[in-house]
Structures are given as structure tokens and as C-alpha cells.
Regions:
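AMP-binding/adenylate-forming catalytic core of the ANL superfamily
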Residues: 4-10, 15, 23, 38-128, ...
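Glycine-rich active-site loop/lid that clamps phosphate-bearing ligands
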Residues: 1
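General small-molecule cofactor/ligand-binding pocket signal
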Residues: 133-136
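Adenylate-forming
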Residues: 18
Length: 152
């Protein structure tokens, strides 16, 4: 997502990083602010948020947003929390890895992993399914409650 701010700054858009000219220069180009967010516009003109550009998983030439995969997995009644990240892969470059916290009383089994993978295959593009599924007790989070993908 890029915001045009020239000739005058747009209300609500920051003017730069405090005492960090290099970081400011990396997001401002010719009066345009590059947010680092990725979205797409449908035929009706609505914008759909995909995620952060630095979170995008690049697998076999495809660009996969973790937010879509997380949202799909969260539809399952036995999933309490989910975080999706990239895992290195020799053939594909990266693959989708899903770290999942199950509701109390549900056990993470190989059969459940396959069920989750098949669910994602049938509710998104088949290449987006998590090739790695890990069950965890909890997910690492920032102080504001956001999942720390780099720790998954």
C-alpha cells in the first residue's frame, strides 16, 4: 500500500522515523509513503488486506500471505490460536508452517494435522496449505498481543 502525500502531507501520515534518516528514506519516495502493507482490490473497488510485505511467504514462485491461512485455520472449532510463518525449504525456497494451539481436551495427532492441511487446501488455493503443522501450548506474543512470527 502506497499513500500519495505530495504536495502536502496527508493528515495522519507520519513524517518520518525519529532520528533515523535511513529508515525514513527507505519508506518515502517522491512524495509517496510505502507502508509495507500488502492488499488487493476486487472488481467492485474494495480493498482486501493481505498482510505485511515482510511477512509474505515466497514458495515455488507464489506469494502467500499468512493472514489468509491463519483466518482459514481459525474457522476450525478445535483451534484456539494459530500463527503462520515461513519455513526454509530446499526445493520451494520457503513453505507455509502453521503453529497451532488447540482448545483444551483436543490432542494434536497426525490425523488432525492431515485434516487441517486438507481443510486449507479446499478453502484456499491448494498451494497455500501448511506443509508443516506444529501443535504448541502457546504462541510467542509481543506486549501488545501480536504473534511474533519470527519466533515460530
Amino acid at each position: 500500500i502506497v499513500i500519495h502525500t505530495d504536495p502536502a502531507p496527508t493528515c495522519g501520515v507520519f513524517l518520518g522515523y525519529y532520528l533515523n534518516k535511513d529508515a525514513t528514506d527507505s519508506v518515502w519516495h517522491d512524495g509517496m509513503y510505502h507502508t509495507g502493507d500488502v492488499a488487493w482490490r476486487d472488481e467492485d473497488g474494495y480493498y482486501w488486506y493481505v498482510g505485511r510485505a515482510d511477512d509474505v511467504i515466497k514458495s515455488s514462485g507464489y506469494r502467500i500471505g499468512p493472514f489468509e491461512i491463519e483466518s482459514t485455520i481459525m474457522e476450525l472449532p478445535y483451534v484456539l490460536e494459530c500463527g503462520v510463518s515461513a519455513a526454509p525449504d530446499e526445493v520451494r525456497g520457503q513453505v507455509v508452517k502453521a503453529s497451532i494451539v488447540l482448545v483444551p481436551g483436543v490432542e494434536g495427532t497426525e490425523e488432525l494435522k492431515k485434516e487441517i492441511q486438507n481443510y486449507v487446501k479446499t478453502h484456499t488455493a491448494p498451494y497455500k496449505y501448511p506443509r508443516i503443522v506444529v501443535f504448541r501450548k502457546d504462541l510467542p506474543k509481543t506486549i501488545s498481543g501480536k504473534i511474533m512470527r519470527n519466533k515460530l
